[in-house]
Swiss-Prot record:
GO biological process: nucleotide metabolic process; purine nucleoside triphosphate catabolic process
Cofactor: Mg(2+)
Lineage: Bacteria, Pseudomonadati, Pseudomonadota, Gammaproteobacteria, Chromatiales
Keywords assigned by UniProt, alphabetized: Hydrolase, Magnesium, Metal-binding, Nucleotide metabolism, Nucleotide-binding
PANTHER family xref list: INOSINE TRIPHOSPHATE PYROPHOSPHATASE, INOSINE TRIPHOSPHATE PYROPHOSPHATASE/HAM1 PROTEIN
Protein name in UniProt: dITP/XTP pyrophosphatase
Catalytic activity: XTP + H2O = XMP + diphosphate + H(+); dITP + H2O = dIMP + diphosphate + H(+); ITP + H2O = IMP + diphosphate + H(+)
Entry coiled-coil feature ranges: none
Species of origin: Halorhodospira halophila (strain DSM 244 / SL1) (Ectothiorhodospira halophila (strain DSM 244 / SL1))
Residues the entry annotates as binding substrate: 7-12, 69, 153-156, 176, 181-182
SUPFAM superfamilies given in the database record: ITPase-like
Stored Gene3D superfamilies: 3.90.950.10
Entry's family note: Belongs to the HAM1 NTPase family.
Length: 199
């Protein structure tokens, strides 16, 4: 079964491909099919994931999986939230987004540094699927003051798992997959579509 992954993010593709090993599913990234990314006009992770999945399903004629994820920091009123990938501007990269996050927290003092990664995954069998499978995962930790680690992407270097005392960027792939918001969401999604991707 071929499924199009509605993302241009190579890190997300690598994580999903790794976690889908053993299932009868070939995951192809939208870019490999010449599909562009739609405008993310939703106000929630769920809305944006549906927009992305529907866009890819329409253009590819294939089932589509989309993920919308981000980091919510209570001390910042839930920011960066749905704007996590473009927190420092629409063309900003991971380093600039991390720099802005740390600056915003620094301005507010050293109080509450909790943060929660959220991931919503959506599976559409076709563009007009009236009953999409929707899964959510979350991972709560602490935002550290100095980036650590070289794995992962996004805010991983500043997101510390409280039980392990390591940032997401310090974890190897199996450890991260077992704990992460994306790992949780994908496992829940697979349960919801198990009959369709069973190996």
């Amino acid at each position: 079964m071929k499924i199009v992954l509605a993302t241009g993010n190579a890190g997300k593709l690598a994580e999903m491909t790794r976690m889908l090993q053993g299932y009868d599913a070939e995951v192809v990234r939208q870019g490999h099919l010449g599909i562009d990314s739609p405008a993310e006009t939703g106000l929630t992770f769920v809305e944006n994931a549906l927009i992305k999945a529907r866009h890819c399903a329409e253009r590819s004629g294939l089932p589509a999986v989309a993920d919308d994820s981000g980091l919510a920091v209570p001390a910042l009123g839930g920011e960066p939230g749905i704007y996590s990938a473009r927190y420092a501007g629409s063309d900003a990269g991971d380093a600039a987004n991390i720099e802005r996050l740390l600056a915003e927290l620094s301005e507010r003092g050293q109080g509450d540094r909790r943060g929660t990664f959220h991931c919503v995954m959506v599976y559409l069998r076709h563009a007009a699927d009236p009953a999409p499978v929707i899964a959510h995962g979350s991972w709560t930790g602490r935002i550290v003051e100095t980036p650590r680690g070289h794995h992962g992407f996004g805010y991983d270097p500043v997101f510390e798992d409280p039980e392990l005392g390591q940032t997401a960027a310090e974890l190897d792939a199996p450890a991260k997959d077992a704990r992460s918001h994306r790992g949780q969401a994908l496992r829940a999604l697979i349960q919801g579509i198990a009959a369709e991707v069973a190996g």
